Amino acid sequence: RVLFRSFVCNLKGGGSKTVSTASLSHAFRAHPQLLFEDLRILAIDFDPQASLTMFLSHENSVGLVENTAAQAMLQNVSREELLSDFIVPSIIPGVDVIPASIDDAFLAEGWKGLCEEHLPGKNIHAVLKENIIDKLQHDYDFIFLDSGPHLDAFLKNCIGAADLMLTPLPPATVDFHSSLKFVASLPALIDSIEMDGHTCNLIGNVGFMSKILNKSDHKICHSQAKEVFGADMLDMVLPRLDGFERCGETFDTVISANPATYDGSTEALKSAKSAAEDFAKAVFDRIEFIRTNGGM
């Protein structure tokens, strides 16, 4: 199986990027129908808030964390160092994470100068792909990327490294509008990366509804999103359920949460887990379809 890289991206804060990425990472490994695939999953966190790290390996999101994904890029460490010093296991075996830290924000801010100093001759948008992902292509089957809601060097590196983008579309009016504005600006953003000398290998951008309820205005948003994305819109959604919010409070995903210690209705947890698994299977099937057909 050839490594496939997905980037869940939206410039709207609170748009379910991290919840989606964490749920996909765990569900790709633990979904009953995907167990036999024995998929090796790596999540890479570039959000200085380290929310993805909290979900997947919360002990690595506390205090001073020096071995972050941003540092791995900048230090251009070897594959062996990546595996031994930077990659940490999540609570589900077979799913690993490279953490983020609040200090990474300063690296993103001065990225161009840092690259000129530490990585002379390297394209500033190709660092993630060349210094991390290319070294791990035989160690993982899927890599999920998560960045903060900022148009910074890390987001551009994620776009420059991804095979596929996934855009969560929350239906709240302001969130939905800003999400569609981001989608409209993507071609120009990709052009700017390529004009700087790095070729993007994006096959496409798949949209999906997040935080959705069974309400008429949410259904209208879903219809409008289908008009924008066409066949690139997933029918499967990531609904707004109590289980997702409660699990976030205990640094779990709905996949990894223990029903015995879950602070809430076990039925609610079961519903959220089922929704996350259904969503992950739909994403997996779409990726396999794209691979088989050589594009969208």
Regions from the language model: what does each represent?
Residues 1-296:
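P-loop NTP-binding core
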